[in-house]
């Protein structure tokens, strides 16, 4: 009787111990505190932490979040609005951060090209460290998810590289995402190419998954250039971008004339006609 009772107690102790240990480890991920996100659709102010100049009129601006352990909370492929009062009038401009929530805790970064007659871009260029900007978001109809397409073709011009770079980085940093990416990136001159070292590093690390064609409007006399010259043509798109299919998507971002031309060529190649306002599932999406 005592033996049976002792065996029963031992069995109960082992069972309870197993349940406790199993619950502790299997629930470890669930018990981790949720990541703090910052964006909430309301206007918020963020201070400029650093400014990294890339060209004579382009820089990466890093803004701090109110909490050092928080992230911006922006879905990949979406953008934020920046507000500023210029000559007594409120102006708005949308930008896609180049940073990802997965690797930017306590801050976010914007790639901005400033124009002499620009509004928000000029305001950003004149910011001093510690100055604040007003931001609201998330905004946009695109939200990238891993493996949503087998292939993604991208056409970008100038700072239109921002959403493409964000998506490429997200794919590159996720070993489970097997999406193949082909990017055609156009600029006026060689010095205007933005984020080239970062882009080239990802291509070098995963050449079978990422391919980039750089295009320029012109090169200086005697300057070496291994890319293409001129405008993005039907032949360029046919050769360097995925063919239209249900498993492929074409993303566009850049100067309006370039985007309009790419939309027309895409139709001639067999892609669906781009809609006036692009949605996530469109075969051709213009940011």
UniProtKB/Swiss-Prot annotation:
Transmembrane segment boundaries: 5-25
Coiled coil segments of this chain: none
Keyword DNA repair found: no
Keyword line: FAD, Flavoprotein, Membrane, Mitochondrion, Mitochondrion outer membrane, NAD, Oxidoreductase, Transferase, Transmembrane, Transmembrane helix
Gene3D superfamilies xrefs: Nucleotide-binding domain of ferredoxin-NADP reductase (FNR) module, Translation factors
Compartments in which it is found: Mitochondrion outer membrane
Pathway stated in the Swiss-Prot or TrEMBL entry: Protein modification; peptidyl-diphthamide biosynthesis
One GO cellular component term noted in the UniProt record for this chain: mitochondrial outer membrane
Gene Ontology MF terms in the entry: 2-(3-amino-3-carboxypropyl)histidine synthase activity; cytochrome-b5 reductase activity, acting on NAD(P)H; NADH dehydrogenase activity
Signal peptide stretch: none
EC numbers on record: 1.6.2.2
Residues reported to bind FAD: 125-142, 151-183
Domain called FAD-binding FR-type: residue spans: 41-145
Cofactor(s) in the UniProt record: FAD
Function field: NADH-dependent reductase for DPH3 and cytochrome b5. Required for the first step of diphthamide biosynthesis, a post-translational modification of histidine which occurs in elongation factor 2. DPH1 and DPH2 transfer a 3-amino-3-carboxypropyl (ACP) group from S-adenosyl-L-methionine (SAM) to a histidine residue, the reaction is assisted by a reduction system comprising DPH3 and a NADH-dependent reductase, predominantly CBR1. By reducing DPH3, also involved in the formation of the tRNA wobble base modification mcm5s 2U (5-methoxycarbonylmethyl-2-thiouridine), mediated by the elongator complex.
Family statement drawn from the similarity comment of this UniProt entry: Belongs to the flavoprotein pyridine nucleotide cytochrome reductase family.
Protein name: NADH-cytochrome b5 reductase 1
Organism: Eremothecium gossypii (strain ATCC 10895 / CBS 109.51 / FGSC 9923 / NRRL Y-1056)
Taxonomic path: Eukaryota, Fungi, Dikarya, Ascomycota, Saccharomycotina
Gene: CBR1
């Amino acid at each position: 009787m005592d033996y049976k009772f002792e065996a029963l107690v031992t069995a109960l102790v082992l069972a309870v111990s197993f349940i406790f240990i199993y619950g502790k480890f299997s629930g470890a991920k669930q018990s981790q505190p949720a990541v703090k996100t910052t964006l909430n659709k309301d206007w918020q102010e963020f201070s400029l932490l650093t400014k990294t100049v890339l060209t004579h009129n382009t820089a990466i601006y890093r803004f701090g979040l109110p909490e050092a352990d928080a992230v911006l909370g922006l879905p990949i492929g979406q953008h934020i609005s920046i507000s500023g009062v210029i000559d007594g009038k409120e102006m708005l401009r949308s930008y896609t951060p180049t940073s990802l929530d997965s690797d930017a805790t306590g801050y976010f970064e914007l790639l901005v090209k400033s124009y002499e007659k620009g509004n928000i871009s000029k305001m950003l260029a004149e910011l001093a460290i510690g100055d604040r900007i007003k931001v609201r978001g998330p905004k946009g109809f695109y939200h990238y998810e891993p493996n949503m397409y087998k292939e993604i073709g991208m056409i970008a011009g100038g700072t239109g590289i921002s959403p493409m770079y964000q998506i490429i980085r997200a794919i590159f940093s996720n070993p489970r995402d097997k999406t193949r990416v082909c990017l055609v990136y156009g600029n006026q001159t060689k010095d205007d190419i933005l984020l080239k070292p970062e882009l080239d590093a990802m291509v070098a690390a995963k050449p079978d998954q990422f391919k980039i064609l750089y295009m320029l409007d012109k090169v200086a006399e005697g300057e070496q250039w291994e890319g293409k010259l001129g405008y993005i043509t039907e032949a360029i798109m046919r050769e360097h971008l995925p063919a239209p299919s249900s498993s492929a998507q074409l993303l566009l971002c850049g100067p309006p004339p370039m985007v309009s031309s790419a939309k027309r060529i895409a139709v001639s190649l067999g892609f669906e006609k781009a809609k006036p306002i692009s949605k996530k599932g469109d075969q051709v999406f213009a940011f």
